[in-house]
């Protein structure tokens, strides 16, 4: 379970909520797994080059990257989209470059055991606005 922090990157958080409501993230595959560093998903083609249409404007977040931080994957400024990653450890070189979307609040041990090709389903938790 990861908690989206809309105050940190409000435009990105809004886009992610809309994609979740539309069902975009149903059965998404982790296409990139680097043990001890990061797992990445959000590409419906599962190869790392796809995503939702369009791109998101970059938002700076000074939040540090620690175990379980969820960040926006980028290929450069204003290139964010539906791909996101979760880090396994302290990664200070990502802070201020990749917007932070939230943190894993439950199941970090599961996150640490994810293998390439494992899938996830993102949905709104009960009690969240629909």
Where is each model-derived feature located?
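Cyclophilin-like peptidyl-prolyl cis-trans isomerases
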Residues: 1-130
């Amino acid at each position: 379970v990861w908690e989206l922090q809309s105050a940190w990157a409000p435009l990105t958080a809004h886009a992610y909520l809309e994609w979740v409501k539309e069902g975009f993230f149903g059965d998404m595959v982790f296409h990139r797994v680097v043990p001890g560093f990061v797992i990445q998903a959000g590409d419906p083609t599962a190869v790392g080059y796809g995503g939702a249409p369009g791109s998101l404007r970059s938002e700076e977040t000074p939040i540090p990257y620690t175990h379980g931080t969820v960040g926006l994957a980028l290929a450069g400024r204003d290139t964010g989209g539906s791909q996101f990653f979760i880090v396994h450890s302290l990664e200070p070189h990502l802070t201020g470059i990749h917007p932070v979307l939230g943190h894993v609040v439950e199941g970090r041990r599961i996150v640490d055991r994810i293998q390439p090709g494992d899938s996830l389903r993102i949905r709104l938790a009960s009690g969240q606005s629909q």
